[in-house]
């Protein structure tokens, strides 16, 4: 910047007036000259910007021409590559948009420059005087340079602010001066008034002194005495007062004179200010006139520029049109040249034939001896000419037929376009409603889009066929003209030969005409344009194509259609034979008279599919409403009914089919795969899942009330007496076990201990004492930090010693209390009491020792629950309100434990946890065979069989199982929610995302396959640990590999630097062994192996295939990488697996009444109730999957 600091501007207005008028005029002229030069320079910059804009536009047009030429070349070279042409068109559009943005930026810069000029001229016209002084001083300081636009703007801005302040100061001083003059005038008037008053008083006093003097003289004369001394004294006083008044009057007069002089000075200053103001106004008016003239000139220039731009644009348009016309003419010229060359070749051939004919004619004239032979030959040639004429007439009729068909195809093309427009409008209207649906509706709309692309391809093929027909027609017309010319020539030759006039043989041709006609035949295209008239394979192929698309659209709900049924979306994906078939398909079918019917069937099929979508939307809405109503009714029924009686179980199993199929729809997403106990009514957030459940019901293909029973939901009732005595024996062993351990450290038992309590030694559950490793004390591991809610102080201690005085008691008291609780449970099991008949202390002991609920929940149950019947009949809201369990996962844990105990202690429970089929629950046939083989006296059951793996509690899940899956980052959330192995199969997507913070979908997939691994092992923890130890050093049994074992395998391949990337990734053996879609590329992506490291990727691919083939039951598809297949999403994959047996296995873990009476509120995703199998059916047919699951307790 040349000047950052503004020069000092004198605030004295009289200094500027000291200059003479000539000097002021010269400075003004110099100022105007500089301003004009600045304006011209800015106009030059504007012109340069406009020139740059014009060059950019010219470049844009050149690029447009280049784009058009490239498009023409592409259309000529690759007319069938629609996908490539579409990509090129998109690129050209993007470039055009970029050029338009550049043009908009240039226009904005031009507008900014125009606004800058207007603002500059406005400032100059308003502040000419200040600008003149500033420019004069700046030129005096730096005479060598001219300031830039930025400096001029800064100077104008500062001058405007300075002179605005100066104007305000001058006005303020003038106002103060006028006020002071007014005050002084008032004071002068007051002083004059006082002087007049003093004069009056003085005159009155003088007259008063004279009168008393006369009176005194008379009295003196009369009396001989007078007050002469007193009068003299008063006169002296009055004279002194008069002198003082005179002095004051003199002072006032002096002040008045001073004020008058000041007033005159102010008037002079005011006059000079008025004169300066008049001069400034004149200069301002002059500058305004100049500005108006400049604006008028600029408007004229702009008008001229706009007219020039319009002329330029019109010239450019004309040039483009001329270029297009030139291109067309060049194309036509090329085609004409090719036709001309062909005609020249034909003329040469005709000349050769004519020479041959002349030679033959000469030979015949020389050799002709008799005229009858020549006449016979002529008669033969006339007959051949007649035949040629007949064939020519047939050919003309064929041409007329082709023209009629061409017109029909044009009309059909118009109708197809109208139908396409109608379909577009209908699809637009439909898209407003289909946007509210879930992913299935979106996929169907994508299918419709593919069908529309097929229709566009057909339209393009139709236009190509029309062009081919036009070319064929032109060639036929040309051949016709050539034939007529040849006929005339041959007739003239015949007339010359016979010596007759040309009119006598107008319908005759020589024998070479037939050769000419057949020699021209090969010039016609011998390919596909004429063949499809008699071919039916094209139509059959097209029917197969559309039928395949229709089948795919009908199978789009379950995604079970093979990948081969999906038609390729673009012609570029077809191979050679497919392209020929597609060409025959579109050309023959659309050019044949029956092609219109196929177009109509396509439109009808689209309309039917759209109507089906609308009907399905209505059905889904009705289903949602009925589901909500029935869920509310069922919730009221569940809250008022018990779950302990066999009759109620059978009545609930005999619900009407409509209720069993509709009211038990799950409010959880399909990714959960099974029911999640929830008693809340369906919320609007889960409407989409209701729709998917409705679709899955339709996929199952089972009518309401007639379908086969789904196994694994509701087990049959069996006796309970045999296993209860064995339960009592197991409890007795547990009560006498020496491994009870020391009691836990006492601490305050509040819900905040979920987050704030330090690690404590937990009370070992009864099952852990029974079936844990005998050589280890089963207290909480000291080195493992966990939220041990089950290990808080007992509820009795809290109830009897709320101040924490129980800490002073020894471990013997705690052992005695635990022994007393075990004795209560042992007594209940020995008596064979169902869970509903348990008393309050037994239920509390069960909650504390077996379920592992926190102490404050146990205390709340002690206060509110007095028997097992109350506990069994508690609804979800009552559990939350009465016991105070606000966490829904804690409520889920309690409900699952209650239902498990109700099923284990009910009279209809199975006599053994292992049945002939290997499952926990049994069919009627198994139950009858078992009751027939079992004596009524056996009333004991081994708790080693039922709860043999009951130590899979929330501590095992958080400390052992989740790290083995590679998901240790979710440990704290699982521990806080008390998630044990019983709850794993009942967690839905909402709970995983919300409370367990498992937002990553891949981590949810990993968790799902970990649960599937546990289910395949029957939740056998010892078996899992044994198999992991056996496969620690060998490549076998990959399904049980932990995340650490997978990392070790990767390190053993020589990829140790990438193995650490699998930490907290969710990669484990069950994912590798059970997920059919997981391949080496996914593993390389998780290992973060760069794509440039081809050697490492090849090694990983080889070893991964060896691992899958040796250690799993999977078989890698060799063509999977080559063939394009569209696999369903993992949600739908889970749903299909649920239908194949995952959900029945998860349902087998629940007791009968849990599915029947509470299923309306708890929900099961897309599965009806399992009905009781009638006698006579085999148990194997009622099983959807052979995987058996053991019941466990945590």
Swiss-Prot record:
Localization in the cell: Cytoplasm; Cytoplasmic vesicle, Secretory vesicle, Acrosome
An annotated GO cellular component: presynaptic active zone cytoplasmic component
Modification Phosphothreonine occurs at: 714, 792
Domain of life: Eukaryota
Gene Ontology biological-process entries: neurotransmitter secretion; regulation of short-term neuronal synaptic plasticity; synaptic vesicle docking; synaptic vesicle exocytosis
Coiled-coil annotated residue ranges, if any: 26-133, 171-501, 596-644, 1014-1040
Signal peptide: none
Transmembrane found in the keyword field: no
Residues covered by the SAM domain: 838-904, 953-1017, 1041-1110
Ranges where the record places region Disordered: 1-23, 201-233, 522-588, 624-817, 1157-1194
Pfam families membership: SAM_1, SAM_2
SMART domains, A to Z: SAM
Residue spans of biased composition, Basic and acidic residues class: 201-217, 548-559, 624-636, 687-701
Modified residues (Phosphoserine): 17, 142, 207, 431, 508, 640, 645, 668, 683, 737, 794, 1123, 1164
InterPro entries: Liprin, Liprin-alpha_SAM_rpt_1, Liprin-alpha_SAM_rpt_2, Liprin-alpha_SAM_rpt_3, SAM, SAM/pointed_sf
Tissues expressed in: Detected in sperm (at protein level).
Keyword NADP attributed: no
Comp. bias intervals (Low complexity): 651-666, 1157-1169
PROSITE patterns per the UniProt record, alphabetical: SAM_DOMAIN
Keywords: Coiled coil, Cytoplasm, Cytoplasmic vesicle, Phosphoprotein, Repeat
Domain notes: The N-terminal coiled coil regions mediate homodimerization preferentially and heterodimerization type alpha/alpha. The C-terminal, non-coiled coil regions mediate heterodimerization type alpha/beta and interaction with PTPRD, PTPRF and PTPRS.
Described purpose of this protein according to its UniProt entry: May regulate the disassembly of focal adhesions. May localize receptor-like tyrosine phosphatases type 2A at specific sites on the plasma membrane, possibly regulating their interaction with the extracellular environment and their association with substrates.
Subunit structure: Forms homodimers and heterodimers with liprins-alpha and liprins-beta. Interacts with the second PTPase domain of PTPRD, PTPRF and PTPRS. Binds RIMS1, RIMS2, RIMS3 and RIMS4.
UniProt record similarity statement: Belongs to the liprin family. Liprin-alpha subfamily.
Stated name of the protein: Liprin-alpha-3
Organism field: Mus musculus (Mouse)
């Amino acid at each position: 910047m040349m000047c950052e600091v503004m020069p000092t501007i004198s605030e004295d207005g009289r200094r500027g007036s000291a200059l003479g008028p000539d000097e002021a005029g010269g400075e003004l002229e110099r100022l105007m000259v500089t301003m004009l030069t600045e304006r011209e320079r800015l106009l030059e910059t504007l012109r340069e910007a406009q020139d740059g804009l014009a060059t950019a536009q010219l470049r844009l047009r050149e690029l447009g021409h280049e784009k058009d030429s490239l498009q023409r070349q592409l259309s000529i070279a690759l007319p069938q590559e629609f996908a490539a042409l579409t990509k090129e068109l998109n690129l050209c559009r993007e470039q055009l948009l970029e050029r338009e943005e550049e043009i908009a930026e240039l226009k904005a810069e031009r507008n900014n420059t125009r606004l800058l000029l207007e603002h500059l001229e406005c400032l100059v016209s308003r502040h000419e005087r200040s600008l003149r002084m500033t420019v004069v001083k700046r030129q005096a300081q730096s005479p060598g340079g001219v300031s830039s636009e930025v400096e001029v703007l800064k100077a104008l801005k500062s001058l405007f602010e300075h002179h605005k302040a100066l104007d305000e100061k001058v006005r303020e001083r003038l106002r103060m001066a006028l006020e002071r003059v007014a005050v002084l005038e008032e004071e002068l008037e007051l002083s004059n008034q006082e002087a007049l008053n003093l004069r009056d008083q003085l005159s009155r006093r003088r007259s008063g002194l004279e009168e008393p003097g006369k009176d005194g003289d008379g009295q003196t004369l009369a009396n001989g005495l007078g007050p002469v001394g007193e009068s003299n004294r008063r006169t002296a006083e009055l004279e002194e007062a008069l002198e003082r008044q005179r002095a004051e009057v003199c002072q006032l007069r002096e002040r008045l004179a001073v004020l008058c002089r000041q007033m005159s000075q102010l008037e002079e200053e005011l006059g000079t200010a008025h004169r300066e103001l008049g001069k400034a106004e004149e200069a301002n008016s002059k500058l305004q006139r100049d500005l108006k003239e400049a604006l008028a000139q600029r408007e004229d220039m702009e008008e001229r520029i706009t007219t020039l731009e319009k002329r330029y644009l019109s010239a450019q348009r004309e040039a483009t049109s001329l270029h297009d016309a030139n291109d067309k003419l060049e194309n036509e010229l090329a085609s004409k040249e090719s036709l001309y060359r062909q005609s020249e070749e034909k003329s040469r051939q005709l000349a050769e034939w004519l020479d041959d004919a002349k030679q033959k004619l000469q030979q015949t004239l020389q050799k002709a001896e008799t005229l009858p032979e020549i006449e016979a030959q002529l008669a033969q040639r006339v007959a051949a000419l007649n035949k040629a004429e007949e064939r020519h007439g047939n050919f003309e009729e064929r041409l007329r037929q082709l023209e009629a068909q061409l017109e029909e195809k044009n009309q059909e093309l118009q109708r197809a376009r109208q139908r396409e427009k109608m379909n577009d409008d209908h699809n637009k209207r439909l898209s407003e409603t289909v946007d509210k649906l879930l992913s299935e509706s979106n996929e169907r709309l994508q299918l419709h889009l593919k069908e529309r692309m097929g229709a566009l391809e057909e339209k393009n093929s139709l236009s190509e066929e029309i062009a081919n027909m036009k070319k064929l027609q032109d060639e036929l017309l040309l051949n016709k003209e050539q034939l007529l010319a040849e006929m005339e020539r041959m007739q003239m030759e015949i007339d010359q030969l016979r010596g007759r006039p040309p009119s006598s043989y107008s319908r005759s041709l020589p024998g070479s005409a037939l050769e000419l006609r057949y020699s021209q035949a090969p010039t016609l295209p011998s390919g596909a344009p004429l063949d499809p008239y008699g071919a039916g394979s094209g139509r059959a192929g097209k029917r197969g194509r559309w039928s395949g698309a229709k089948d795919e659209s009908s199978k789009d709900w379950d995604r079970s259609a093979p990948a081969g049924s999906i038609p390729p979306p673009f012609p570029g994906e077809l191979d050679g034979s497919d392209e020929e078939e597609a060409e025959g398909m579109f050309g023959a079918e659309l050019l044949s008279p029956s092609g219109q019917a196929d177009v109509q069937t396509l439109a009808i099929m689209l309309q039917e599919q759209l109507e089906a979508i609308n009907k399905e939307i209505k059905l889904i809405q009705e289903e949602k409403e009925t589901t909500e109503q029935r869920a509310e009714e069922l919730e009221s029924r569940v809250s008022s009914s018990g779950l302990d009686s066999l009759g109620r179980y059978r009545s609930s199993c005999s619900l009407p089919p409509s209720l069993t199929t509709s009211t038990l729809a799950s409010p959880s997403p399909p990714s959960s795969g099974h029911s999640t106990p929830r008693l809340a009514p369906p919320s609007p957030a889960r409407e989409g899942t209701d729709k998917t459940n409705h679709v899955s019901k339709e996929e199952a293909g089972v009518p309401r009330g007639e379908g086969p029973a789904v196994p694994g939901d509701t087990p049959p009732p069996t006796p309970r007496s045999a296993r209860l005595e064995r339960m009592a024996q197991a409890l007795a062993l547990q009560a006498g076990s020496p491994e009870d351990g020391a009691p836990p450290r006492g601490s305050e038992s509040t819900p905040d201990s979920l987050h704030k309590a330090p690690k404590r030694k937990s009370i070992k559950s009864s099952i852990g004492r029974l079936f844990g490793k005998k050589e280890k004390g089963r207290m909480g591991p000291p080195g493992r930090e966990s939220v041990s809610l089950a290990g808080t102080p007992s509820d009795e201690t809290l109830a009897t010693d709320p101040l924490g005085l129980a800490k002073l008691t020894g471990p013997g008291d705690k052992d005695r209390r635990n022994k007393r609780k075990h004795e209560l449970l042992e007594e209940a099991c020995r008596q064979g009491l169902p869970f509903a008949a348990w008393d309050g202390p037994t239920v509390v002991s069960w909650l504390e020792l077996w379920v592992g609920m926190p102490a404050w929940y146990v205390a709340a149950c002690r206060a509110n629950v007095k028997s097992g019947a109350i506990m069994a009949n508690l609804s979800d809201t009552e559990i939350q309100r009465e016991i105070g369990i606000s966490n829904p996962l804690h409520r889920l844990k309690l409900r699952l434990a209650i239902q498990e105990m109700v099923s284990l202690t009910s009279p209809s429970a199975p006599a053994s946890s292992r049945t002939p089929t290997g499952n926990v629950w049994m069919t009627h046939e198994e139950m009858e065979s078992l009751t027939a083989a079992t004596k009524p006296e056996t009333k004991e059951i081994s708790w080693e069989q039922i709860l043999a793996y009951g130590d899979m509690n929330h501590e095992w899940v958080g400390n052992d199982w989740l790290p083995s899956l590679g998901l240790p980052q979710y440990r704290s959330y699982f521990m806080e929610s008390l998630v044990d192995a019983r709850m794993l199969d009942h967690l839905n997507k909402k709970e995983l995302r919300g409370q367990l913070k498992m937002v990553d979908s891949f981590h949810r997939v990993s968790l799902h396959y970990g649960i599937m691994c546990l289910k395949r092992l029957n939740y056998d923890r010892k078996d899992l640990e044994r198999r992991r130890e056996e496969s620690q050093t060998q490549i076998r049994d990959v399904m049980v590999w932990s995340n650490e074992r997978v990392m070790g395998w990767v390190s053993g391949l020589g990829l140790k630097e990438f193995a650490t990337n699998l930490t907290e990734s969710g990669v484990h053996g069950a994912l590798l062994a059970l997920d059919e879609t997981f391949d080496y590329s996914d593993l390389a992506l998780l290992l973060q192996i760069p794509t440039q490291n081809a050697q490492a990727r090849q090694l990983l691919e080889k070893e991964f295939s060896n691992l899958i083939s040796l250690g799993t039951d999977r078989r890698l598809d060799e063509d999977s990488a080559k063939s394009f297949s569209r696999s369903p999403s993992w949600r739908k994959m889970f749903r299909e697996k649920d239908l194949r047996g995952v959900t029945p296995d998860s349902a087998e873990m629940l007791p009968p009444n849990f599915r029947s009476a509470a299923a309306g509120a708890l929900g099961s995703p897309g599965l009806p109730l399992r009905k009781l199998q009638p006698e006579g059916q085999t148990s194997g047919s009622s099983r959807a999957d052979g995987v058996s699951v053991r019941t466990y307790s945590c």
